[in-house]
């Protein structure tokens, strides 16, 4: 599997955010295994254990911008039971949260606030873009709306829809868990320029393209 290595770029222009650079690399654990089977296997077990704890205890930041936030809140009700994924502990402060969901229309006036809240999240942190407005500006192709939060934030999972269903949020949460389970982060207590290795996950539209082509009878909304 290919990975994307992300490091801080001190030479990046001030206008660009975040200040980082990325490149495609191979699995770092596979490279370490060639140096020593014992240490390579031990590092793999440690990475899997840490990732297991992180992905099964994702605390979301209680933050919403527009109508998609209503659908996100619906996922926390008893019919959907988001507690199954360890994400029922909603935090009122970004310093206590693991990830934030941009649910709604990112206006230009709101962009600095969103960016500041993202910076207050402690590492490791992740971002889910929920809804057409957060993904690409939606139908608001106007001067006051940012055409996608990925213009100023690194996004891990995109949720399409206007607005998305609560089930779509749960699926995005599971996709984020799968991605976290394959991440390679430094385990040292020394902060340095080790970088973060994120797996290159395939897009769901590409993965399900063959299944959609085979469809001859459309399902009703109750069957989806």
From Swiss-Prot:
Its cofactor is [4Fe-4S] cluster. Belongs to the complex I 20 kDa subunit family. NCBIfam families: nuoB_fam (TIGR01957), PRK06411.1 (NF005012). [4Fe-4S] cluster binds at residues 67-68, 133, 162. The lineage of its organism: Bacteria, Pseudomonadati, Pseudomonadota, Gammaproteobacteria, Aeromonadales. NDH-1 shuttles electrons from NADH, via FMN and iron-sulfur (Fe-S) centers, to quinones in the respiratory chain. The immediate electron acceptor for the enzyme in this species is believed to be ubiquinone. Couples the redox reaction to proton translocation (for every two electrons transferred, four hydrogen ions are translocated across the cytoplasmic membrane), and thus conserves the redox energy in a proton gradient. InterPro entries: NADH_UbQ_OxRdtase-like_20kDa, NADH_UQ_OxRdtase_20Kd_su. GO terms for cellular component: plasma membrane; respiratory chain complex I. Coiled coil: none annotated. It is found in: Cell inner membrane. PANTHER family: NADH DEHYDROGENASE, NADH DEHYDROGENASE [UBIQUINONE] IRON-SULFUR PROTEIN 7, MITOCHONDRIAL. Keywords: 4Fe-4S, Cell inner membrane, Cell membrane, Iron, Iron-sulfur, Membrane, Metal-binding, NAD, Quinone, Translocase, Transport, Ubiquinone. It is a peripheral membrane protein. This is NADH-quinone oxidoreductase subunit B. NDH-1 is composed of 14 different subunits. Subunits NuoB, C, D, E, F, and G constitute the peripheral sector of the complex. Pfam families: Oxidored_q6. GO terms for biological process: aerobic respiration; electron transport coupled proton transport. It comes from the Bacteria. It catalyses: a quinone + NADH + 5 H(+)(in) = a quinol + NAD(+) + 4 H(+)(out). Binds 1 [4Fe-4S] cluster. One of its GO terms (molecular function) is NADH:ubiquinone reductase (non-electrogenic) activity. HAMAP family: NDH1_NuoB (MF_01356). Its EC number is 7.1.1.-. Its main location: membrane. PROSITE patterns: COMPLEX1_20K.
């Amino acid at each position: 599997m290919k990975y994307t290595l992300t490091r801080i770029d001190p030479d990046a222009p001030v206008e660009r955010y975040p200040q980082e650079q990325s490149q495609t690399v191979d699995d770092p654990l596979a490279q370490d295994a060639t140096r020593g089977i014992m240490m390579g296997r031990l590092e793999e077990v440690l990475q899997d254990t840490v990732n297991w704890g992180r992905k099964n205890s994702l605390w979301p930041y209680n933050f919403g911008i527009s109508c998609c936030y209503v659908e996100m809140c619906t996922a926390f009700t008893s019919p959907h039971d988001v507690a199954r994924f360890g994400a029922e502990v909603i935090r009122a402060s970004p310093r206590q949260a693991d990830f934030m969901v941009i649910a709604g229309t990112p206006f230009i006036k709101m962009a600095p606030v969103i960016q500041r809240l993202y910076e207050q999240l402690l590492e490791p942190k992740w971002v889910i873009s929920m809804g057409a407005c957060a993904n690409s500006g939606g139908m608001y192709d106007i001067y006051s709306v940012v055409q996608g939060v990925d213009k100023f934030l690194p996004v891990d999972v995109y949720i399409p829809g206007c607005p998305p269903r609560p089930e779509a949020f749960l699926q995005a949460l599971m996709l984020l868990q799968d991605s976290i389970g394959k991440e390679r982060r430094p385990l040292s207590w020394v902060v340095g320029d080790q970088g973060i290795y994120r797996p290159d996950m395939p897009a769901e539209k590409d993965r399900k393209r063959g299944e959609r082509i085979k469809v001859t009878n459309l399902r009703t909304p109750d069957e989806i």
